[in-house]
Amino acid sequence: MHLENLLKSLKNTVKKLKTYNFGVSMWKVNIGRLMHALNAFKGSKPLFETDEMLMVKGVCRDEEVEKYGSIKDYLVKKLEKEGFEIVEDIKEIDKFVSRINEILKENPLYPDTFGFERMKESFEMIGCECDYVIAKKRNIMVGVCMYFDKKMKNPKFVEVVGVLLPS
C-alpha cells in the first residue's frame, strides 16, 4: 500500500513537471512566430536563453519594410499582426526593464529604458537607421529593434528581447 501511494505521488510529480516545462517553453514559440513574421527566422541565433528570457538576433529579409514610412511603423504593424499590444506607458516599460535586470541579476546600467535610446543614438552616429518597439502579449513582453546602414539598406538586423512576466 505504501509503495502504491509513493508511485502515485511520483507520477503526479512527473505530470506536473511535464506541464510546467511545456508552459515555460511554449511562450518562446511566440518569439519564433515574430521572427517568422519579420522574415528573420532563417539563420537567426539565440544570444541568451533561460526559461524566462530569450534574446534572438537575425537578418530581416522582408521586402515590405521599404513600403513603410519608418522602421517603427513597420515593427508596430508586424507586432500588432502577431497579437502584441504596443506598450508606451513608462510604468509598463519599467516592469519590462526590471524583469530583464532581475533575470540577468544586474542593476540598471542606463538611465533610460534598457538603453534603447542610447543604443539607437549610437547606431545613428555611425550612419545607421535604427528604431525599436516594446510590446506585450498576455504574460510576455518583447523589445524589438531593427537597424541597417542608411546607404546600403541591407542587411537589416533584427534583435528581439523577450521575457516571461510572473503571473
Curated annotation (Swiss-Prot):
InterPro entries, alphabetized: UCP921964
Stated name of the protein: Uncharacterized protein MJ0491
Native source organism of the sequence: Methanocaldococcus jannaschii (strain ATCC 43067 / DSM 2661 / JAL-1 / JCM 10045 / NBRC 100440) (Methanococcus jannaschii)
